[in-house]
UniProtKB/Swiss-Prot annotation:
Its cofactor is Mg(2+); Mn(2+). Keywords: DNA damage, DNA repair, DNA replication, Ligase, Magnesium, Manganese, Metal-binding, NAD, Zinc. It comes from Chlorobaculum parvum (strain DSM 263 / NCIMB 8327) (Chlorobium vibrioforme subsp. thiosulfatophilum). The lineage of its organism: Bacteria, Pseudomonadati, Chlorobiota, Chlorobiia, Chlorobiales. GO terms for cellular component: cytosol. CDD domains: BRCT_DNA_ligase_like, LIGANc. Coiled coil: none annotated. SUPFAM superfamilies: BRCT domain, DNA ligase/mRNA capping enzyme, catalytic domain, Nucleic acid-binding proteins, RuvA domain 2-like. Belongs to the NAD-dependent DNA ligase family. LigA subfamily. This is DNA ligase.
């Protein structure tokens, strides 16, 4: 094909792909299947590969990702990205309206009008367009500065790479100058469920917001592209021609190619605001994405600067948050699940009941200490709550409604999967199955852990596939994964030749992971990711590690006698020795390589612990940021701890730190230290 014909076909493909993106993400009216869409994109990429001089920054091919970002530069926001004041009280919303009315009256204005919008439960970002082209995207950060994550944001189909013509002076300003758009990146419920299905149970995200926050800070933009995210715009700032009202600006954003909140409504007083909040209290559960409240903004944008802001939030807006959803149901029974280490976890079987827009029939009871604390029995009426988490929890027993006949929840005596007599470790609350080699549940759990994101990160090796591999006898341990054939994989349910090859490719890629990750992936009891890194540093090979005695191991930082004994027990098992031989033969990293260079030394000499919920970071990634800057992560507060990063609802660790006089900082200060 000559260049002229290629250019013509590329133009048609780009227009067609963007049209289907708009139909899917903005209008929810898809016309073709994912497979057909992928074929269009593959053809475009093939042509652009053949004719690289025809690639443009706004081509749909630029959404695919593939680059690795070693660190995210800091961006200073031109205008602070303030957070909104939150309230759970309708009365406080009314007080807000009264304050605004007084402030507007003092400015000589009339009766204010408000725009009510649903509050998306996602991550706030800023986008900058120059001459209509997306040039930079960043996180909110601490409000004054954030991280530049342009490459990751370009993978989100609902973020235009080039602004569409909105007509009028605003678009003229966008084409000839700069426009800033702010909004929320979020993950739809179905995309979130799909992502979690691919991960082992212990590595699953608690909710879509956590998944979104973690995904945006990934270094591999190809992985970001694979996890589908969406964007909703709610703020527009250009040089000239912005509409005078917030509602009109939302319309302009839509014309420029952005998705805006579909439910935005003009409200002329508190009665209309209360009606909007009440209307969406239940209706929000029918939406395909998570919303946790309603945002109210003064409609007249010209008054925003005049009303001003406090140090943290604007005076012209407020967020009403819906309270955590609770429901009453009956605990009908308890089943017991078996984890990768044989631990038995009780799970409540509930009378199906509606909660937060879905039917709930199960809830974790954690362990027998929790059962005792709650005083719960089979047959009890219980209150369950869903507050951000995917899995609801039993929060209390309705003792006034306890039936005459209830049954105590008894610990099982045999493994519910393999029938082996259960045992209990001294000083622990949980029972466990000692049949490590033969229990199918433990085999599945160990392999899923081995493939999990913080271990060897083997894509496409999800729970359903691993269950089939174990049931069919194709694998018994992680070492068997590397002997799988395409024929074996293709013979499984919901697997075709291409899917089988994807798994084999992912297994091959996993051989390039670090020695420290392999140590964590082995699933040694008490050895988490941080301990595995210490082991990798102190013991440069698996062979050396297997030779070390308990005293020598206990001298390694963060190990101690209990973990040392666990490591020795693990390597003494014949099935472990056989698995290690298979892993070595497959080419896995059985010894340490070159250490990764530090980003900086800002945390050098610091022993850091995180407690409570972080708003803008996933815990594991925040800990990795500390390590990349020379710091050490510890699991408990002691006199040796030098720094505590406290998030929302920090508990006993914060209290202990205060008593010991350990320095405590919040998430904003943590980001400044990076």
């Amino acid at each position: 094909m000559d260049k002229a014909k290629a250019q013509q076909e590329i133009g048609k493909l780009r227009a067609e792909i963007e049209r289907h993106n708009r139909l899917y993400y903005l209008e929810a009216k898809p016309e073709i299947s994912d497979f057909e869409f992928d074929k269009l994109l593959e053809r475009l990429i093939a042509l652009e590969t053949e004719f690289p001089e025809l690639v443009t920054p706004d081509s749909p091919s630029q959404r695919v990702g593939g680059g690795i970002t070693k660190e995210f530069p800091t961006v200073i926001h031109r205008e602070p990205m303030l957070s909104l004041s939150n309230t759970y009280s309708i009365g406080e919303v009314s007080d807000f309206c009264t304050r605004v009315e007084k402030l507007v009256a003092a400015e000589g204005g009339g009766t204010p009008e408000y725009v009510a919008e649903l509050k998306y439960d996602g991550v706030a970002i800023s986008l900058f367009y120059r001459d209509g082209l997306l040039v930079r995207g960043s996180t909110r950060g601490d409000g004054r500065q954030g991280d530049e994550i342009t490459a990751n944001l370009k993978t989100i189909p609902s973020i235009p790479l080039r602004l569409q013509s909105a007509g009028g002076s605003l678009f003229d300003a966008a084409v000839n100058g700069e426009v800033e758009v702010r909004g929320e990146v979020y993950m739809r419920k179905d995309d979130f469920e799909r992502l979690n299905e691919e991960r082992p149970e212990e590595e699953r995200f608690a909710n879509p917001r956590n998944a979104t926050a973690g995904t945006l800070k990934l270094q591999d933009s190809a992985e970001v592209a694979r996890r589908r995210m969406s964007f909703v715009a709610y703020y527009l700032k250009g040089h000239d021609g912005e509409a005078p009202t917030h509602l009109r600006r939302l319309e302009q954003l839509k014309c420029m190619g952005f998705m805006t909140g579909a439910a935005a409504r003009l409200c002329k007083g508190m009665d209309e605001i209360a009606n909007f909040i009440g209307e969406w209290s239940e209706k929000r559960w029918t939406l395909p994405y998570e919303t946790d409240g309603v945002v109210l903004k003064l409609n007249e944008v010209g008054l925003w600067d005049r009303l001003g802001a406090t140090a943290k939030s604007p005076r012209w807006a407020i967020a009403y948050k819906y309270p955590a959803q609770q429901a009453k149901t009956v605990l009908q029974g308890v089943v017991f699940q078996v984890g990768r280490l044989g631990t038995i976890t009780p799970v409540a079987e509930l009378k199906p009941t509606k909660l937060a827009g879905s039917t709930v029939s199960r809830s974790t009871l954690h362990n027998f200490d929790e059962i005792e604390r709650l005083g719960v029995r089979i047959g009890d009426h219980v209150m369950i709550e869903k507050s951000g988490e995917v899995i609801p929890k039993v929060v209390s027993v309705v003792l006034d409604e306890r039936p005459a006949e209830t049954a105590e929840i008894e610990a099982p005596s045999e493994c519910p999967v393999c029938g082996t007599k259960l045992e209990r470790h001294e000083g622990e609350v949980s029972w466990y199955c000692p049949n490590e080699e033969g229990c199918p549940a433990q085999k599945r759990g160990r392999i899923l852990h081995f493939a999990s994101r913080n271990a060897l990160d083997i894509q496409n090796l999800g729970e359903s596939l691993v269950s089939q591999l174990v049931e069919r006898g194709f694998v018994s341990d992680a070492g068997d994964l590397y002997s799988l054939t395409q024929e074996q994989l293709a013979s499984l349910d919901r697997m075709a030749a291409k899917s089988a090859q994807n798994v084999l490719d992912a297994l091959e890629k996993s051989k390039k992971q670090s020695y420290a990750r392999l140590l964590f992936a082995l699933g040694i009891r008490h050895v988490g990711a941080a301990t595995a890194r210490e082991l990798a540093h102190a013991c440069p090979s698996i062979d050396r590690l297997r030779e070390m005695g308990e005293e020598e191991l206990a001298a390694v930082p963060d190990i101690g006698p209990v973990i040392a004994a666990s490591i020795r027990d693990f390597f003494a098992k014949p099935w472990v020795a056989a698995m290690l031989e298979k892993l070595a033969a497959a080419g896995l990293p059985m010894q340490a390589g070159e250490e990764k260079a530090l980003v900086n030394t800002n945390f050098e000499g610091q022993s850091v612990i995180f407690t409570g919920g972080l708003e803008r970071h996933v815990r594991q990634q925040a800990e990795e940021m500390v390590r990349e800057r020379g710091g050490k992560i510890v699991s408990s507060v002691s006199k040796k701890t030098t720094l505590v990063v406290a998030g929302k609802e920090a508990g006993s660790k914060l209290e202990k730190a205060m008593k010991l006089g350990v320095r405590v900082i919040d998430e904003d200060e943590f980001e400044r230290m990076l």
